[in-house]
Amino acid sequence: MTAKIFSLDEVSKHKTKSDLWVVIHNKVYDITRFVVEHPGGEEVLVDEGGKDATEAFEDIGHSDEAREMLEEYLIGSLDEASRTKEYNVNVIRAGELPEEKKGSSLRIILPALAIIGALVYKYVIVPKAHQ
């Protein structure tokens, strides 16, 4: 089966609850059947209907399961003239959280300042007091 190609103008005609298409990563999805099932409510989908919803989709941070479910609604892709640049998406999946930094520069700066302060006290302030 050859994938259908749609213009953004064609997609924009499908923006109602009873006829809802969205574009995500330059792929066109007919999510009409999913509107009532969407855990975030139908309003958020209708708001993004008929346009490129890539940014909104990625900002929410959908699960792998949601991404897999999306594929069953795929009906084609966006034509070259309508395409947007691909977003650089860094998806954080469960169990793959980025490593937390082990410390900060304060761990070096504060002890260094304490040592400098002690040396100034011992070699500058104390000798002046004994003069």
UniProtKB/Swiss-Prot annotation:
Record Gene3D superfamilies: Cytochrome b5-like heme/steroid binding domain
Domain spans labelled Cytochrome b5 heme-binding: 3-79
GO cellular component, one term: endoplasmic reticulum membrane
Membrane topology term: Single-pass membrane protein
One Pfam family from the record: Cyt-b5
Positions that bind heme: 38, 62
Keyword terms of this UniProt record: Electron transport, Endoplasmic reticulum, Heme, Iron, Membrane, Metal-binding, Microsome, Transmembrane, Transmembrane helix, Transport
Function: Membrane bound hemoprotein which function as an electron carrier for several membrane bound oxygenases.
UniProt name for this protein: Cytochrome b5
Origin species: Rhizopus stolonifer (Rhizopus nigricans)
